[in-house]
């Protein structure tokens, strides 16, 4: 058994128990014989539905002992030779695997004509180059393992050798080192027996010196509580385990460091799986988190309880929860609204036996990606796509998401989700945001919302501003102080979000809006207390109610305003506003309509506000968008109430 296993006897015994008790899985039929079944299970060892309680951190000696039992042969990262053989057999018969291999081989062929990457910095970052190398190496190495074309192997080797010649991998921005290290680790490991000894030694020396040992000198990321910890520990872990026979003590040290520090980043998932940095960074942090766990389980035979940490299993539902029926995400914080395929979602679907996680949005994103045939791999290519092949599984017809219709995330950056149905692409969907602008990648967006209906995204979040363009001007993008340059950027300010602006002033950067109450059920309701992010009101409460007739009511209650101050209610849209602007505003897009009715005052005059053209030369344009809204002046009482009813289809 050890000869075909990815890991030591611990993992083999666990998989033996799974084989004995498992129900028939159609995917397993592609792997004939007991060895084939074990190969697939071991290849996807992280798929075992084990979320046992995490004990205390393991000692360095315990990690070193586990490493001494690790398989000595290459390949060993994510799969051994038998695992790759099983994957190759699956790719010939399984629908998803066949589609994935088609895209993979296409991309690998396109890479043959491209020159290797060079050490070209973008401002303070080498990250774009590291990501390109990771995409190329993982794609070419996987293509060679599954397709056997020597040209893919040779081009992969050339890409890796070019990276070894860089003066360094830019350790001052350690994400760059981490992604480059993951790239060379998998290329070195997966192609080990097909590389000549001199090439292996060159790659190993660069991985050791520019990756692993550099991580002992540049340590600012080691105890990170955000995605840096997940990405950097995964990259360093891959490098150390690929080179374990060259320095076993160092490999054990790096593994132990990852095991005891990853929980710092993983606290973000507690208690219910929401990610404070938004769905875009969920993909980044969670994909690499999954890679780290898969590396530990595959080589050391255990994840040492990491997958049992609070909220981690629950985060499997997060991508679906924050994706509206339009297919766009609730893209709070720095991120785009598109839904891309994620290897982490496939990993969770296997581990938890949850095909419903793939039922709609992930399956569609995956098949869309597989079907595309770009002329050349660009920066938007999915650099971790090759890893997805390890965790593909069937999705039975008729499978639908089983996440709740109404959800309050709790946690440090609370959001609420309300929708009328999962199995109807015209369903109503609303995401509301609380929390603090000073959260990681935060915006001044407390109280902001997105809204889908009739298959259309009506209320938008404009998303992130490009980092390099801001940094190249010398602006301080990463300070959350009240006077920070960050809040001068339109997309990050309260002026661009679907929330209230009082007296033209920004929200309080250190304030923290909370979800006061949340009611589930057919008429779900979220009550957000926004008072802590405003200095110019004694009470600001926003209530969102999903009504039985398929409409949505958003109510704002304000007190303690200075008499005469102006309050603006706003919503960014790509729809065309109708000509009637008193009391009711009709939006139309693609033959669909949404009516906004000012219930609080039928004399309310709806206005439009410029969002498409940049306000400042550092702001990006937001083509095709406009903000609709209205204004009200605080009376002598200092109290205002707004109530807007959203009615789809009229």
Segments the model singles out, each with a brief description of its role:
Residues 9-12, 31, 39:
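Short hydrophobic alpha-helical segments enriched in small aliphatic residues
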Residues 243, 284-458, 519-523, 527-529, ...:
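Carbohydrate-active enzyme catalytic cores, enriched for enzymes
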Residues 76, 370, 469-650:
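CBM-like, beta-strand-rich accessory domains located in the C-terminal region of large
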Residues 36-49:
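Bacterial N-terminal signal peptides
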Residues 74-84, 88-91, 97-328, 335-336, ...:
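Aromatic-lined, polymer-binding surfaces characteristic
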């Amino acid at each position: 058994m050890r000869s075909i296993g990815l890991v030591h006897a611990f993992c083999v015994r666990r998989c033996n128990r799974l084989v004995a008790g498992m129900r028939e899985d159609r995917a397993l039929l592609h792997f004939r014989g007991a060895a084939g079944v074990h190969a697939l299970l071991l290849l996807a060892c992280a798929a075992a539905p084990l979320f046992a309680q995490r004990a205390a951190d393991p000692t360095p000696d315990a990690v070193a002992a586990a490493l001494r039992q690790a398989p000595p042969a290459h390949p060993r990262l994510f799969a051994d030779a038998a695992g790759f053989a099983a994957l190759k057999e699956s790719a010939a018969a399984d629908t998803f695997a066949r589609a994935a291999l088609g895209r993979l081989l296409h991309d690998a062929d396109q890479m043959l004509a491209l020159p290797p990457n060079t050490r070209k910095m973008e401002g303070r970052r080498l990250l774009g180059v590291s990501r390109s190398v990771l995409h190329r190496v993982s794609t070419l190495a996987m293509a060679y393992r599954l397709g056997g074309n020597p040209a893919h192997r040779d081009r992969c080797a050339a890409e890796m050798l070019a990276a070894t010649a860089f003066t360094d991998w830019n350790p001052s921005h350690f994400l760059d080192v981490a992604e480059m290290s993951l790239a060379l680790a998998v290329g070195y490991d997966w192609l080990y027996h097909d590389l000549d000894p001199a090439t292996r030694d060159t790659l190993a020396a660069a991985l050791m010196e520019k990756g692993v040992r550099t991580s002992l000198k540049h340590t600012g990321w080691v105890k990170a509580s955000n995605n840096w910890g997940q990405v950097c520990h995964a990259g360093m872990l891959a490098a150390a385990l690929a080179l374990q026979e060259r320095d076993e003590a160092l490999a054990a040290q790096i593994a132990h460091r990852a095991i005891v520090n990853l929980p710092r980043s993983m606290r973000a998932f507690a208690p219910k799986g929401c990610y404070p940095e938004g769905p875009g960074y969920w993909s980044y942090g969670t994909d690499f988190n999954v890679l780290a766990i898969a590396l530990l389980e595959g080589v050391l035979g255990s994840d040492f309880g990491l997958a049992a940490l609070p909220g981690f299993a629950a985060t499997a539902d997060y991508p679906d929860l924050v994706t509206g029926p339009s297919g766009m995400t609730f893209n709070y914080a720095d991120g785009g609204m598109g839904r891309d395929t994620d290897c982490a979602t496939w990993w969770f679907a296997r581990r938890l036996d949850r095909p419903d996680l793939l039922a709609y949005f992930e399956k569609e994103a995956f098949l869309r990606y597989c079907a595309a045939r770009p002329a050349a791999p660009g920066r938007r290519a999915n650099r971790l796509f090759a890893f997805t092949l390890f965790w593909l599984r069937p999705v039975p017809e008729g499978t639908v998401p089983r996440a709740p219709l109404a959800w309050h995330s709790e946690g440090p950056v609370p959001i609420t989700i309300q929708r009328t149905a999962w199995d109807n692409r015209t369903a109503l969907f609303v995401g509301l945001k609380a929390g603090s602008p000073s959260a990681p990648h935060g915006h001044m967006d407390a109280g902001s919302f997105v809204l889908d209906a009739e298959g259309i995204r009506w209320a938008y979040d404009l998303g992130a501003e490009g980092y390099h363009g801001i940094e190249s001007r010398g602006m301080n993008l990463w300070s959350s102080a009240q006077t920070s340059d960050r809040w001068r950027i339109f997309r990050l300010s309260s002026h661009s979000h679907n929330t209230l602006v009082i007296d033209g002033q920004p929200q309080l950067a250190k304030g923290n809006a909370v979800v006061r109450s949340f009611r589930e059920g057919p008429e779900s309701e979220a009550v957000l207390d926004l008072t802590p992010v405003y200095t110019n009101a004694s009470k600001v409460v926003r209530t969102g109610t999903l009504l039985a007739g398929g409409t949505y009511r958003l109510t704002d209650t304000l007190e303690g305003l200075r008499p005469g101050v102006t309050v603006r209610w706003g919503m960014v849209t790509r729809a065309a506003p109708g000509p009637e602007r008193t009391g009711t505003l009709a939006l139309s897009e693609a033959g669909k309509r949404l009516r906004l009715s000012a219930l609080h005052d039928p004399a309310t005059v709806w206005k439009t506000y410029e969002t498409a053209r940049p306000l400042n030369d550092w702001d990006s344009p937001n083509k095709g968008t406009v903000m609709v809204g209205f204004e009200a002046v605080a009376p002598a009482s200092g109290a205002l109430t707004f109530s807007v009813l959203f009615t789809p289809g009229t």
